[in-house]
């Protein structure tokens, strides 16, 4: 006797996520400038515009850099507000187009944007600064190995004709596959400085943020 063949009903494709709608909803209620959410099977971040910043302190720092003849210390304004959001979205998209590891921008509007987490869902992505600090008990070779990885990650950006915003070790993150990624782009040094000075600024930021560990 021929028995009927019972098959499981076909599962249709998962509905596409409306990132723009999710962003619009969260910006209406989110209290913090940046917050993380689970959205389907991925983790995302919503970054909203903060209070605009004044220019007074940047003018003072600029005058000091000019007085001492140190153009590499010329301040790069972070104006906050919607301008900082637009700057970060533009910079993330530009660096991604250059093949560099940065968070993917999923949706954006004037007062905020949505980006994908640089790592596995529900897992923190450690910064290189955290890794270097944790390596101190293991000795100078372990610290130097991580420090050189950060330096090479910055060099990779420079070789692509770009620069970072604040190249502190805390803004270099270790992705699950071992690649060093880059975060925090609320300002654009290339808008106010020649590229060679931007590269020098990156080197100074990285050296400043890691000097305490190299001394040990």
Language-model features: locations:
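Conserved hydrophobic alpha-helix
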Residues: 95, 150-157
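Catalytic-loop of the protein kinase fold
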Residues: 158-169
């Amino acid at each position: 006797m021929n028995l009927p063949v019972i098959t499981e009903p076909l599962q249709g494709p998962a509905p596409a996520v409306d990132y723009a709608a999710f962003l619009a909803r969260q910006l209406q209620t989110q209290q913090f400038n940046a917050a993380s959410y689970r959205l389907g099977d991925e983790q995302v971040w919503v970054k909203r515009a903060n209070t605009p910043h004044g220019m007074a302190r940047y003018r003072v720092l600029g005058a000091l850099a000019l007085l001492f003849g140190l153009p590499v210390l010329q301040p790069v304004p972070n104006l906050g507000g919607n301008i900082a959001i637009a700057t970060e979205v533009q910079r993330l998209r530009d660096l991604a187009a250059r093949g560099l590891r940065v968070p993917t921008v999923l949706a954006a509007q004037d007062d905020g944007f949505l980006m994908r987490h640089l790592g596995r869902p529900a897992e923190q992505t450690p910064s290189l600064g955290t890794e270097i600090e944790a390596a101190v008990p293991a000795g100078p070779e372990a610290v130097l190995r991580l420090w050189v990885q950060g330096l090479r990650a910055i060099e990779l950006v420079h070789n692509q004709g770009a620069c970072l915003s604040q190249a502190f070790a805390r803004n270099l993150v270790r992705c699950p596959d071992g690649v060093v990624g880059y975060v925090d782009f609320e300002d654009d040094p290339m808008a106010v400085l020649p590229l060679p000075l931007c590269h020098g600024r990156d080197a100074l930021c990285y050296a400043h943020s890691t000097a305490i560990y190299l001394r040990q």
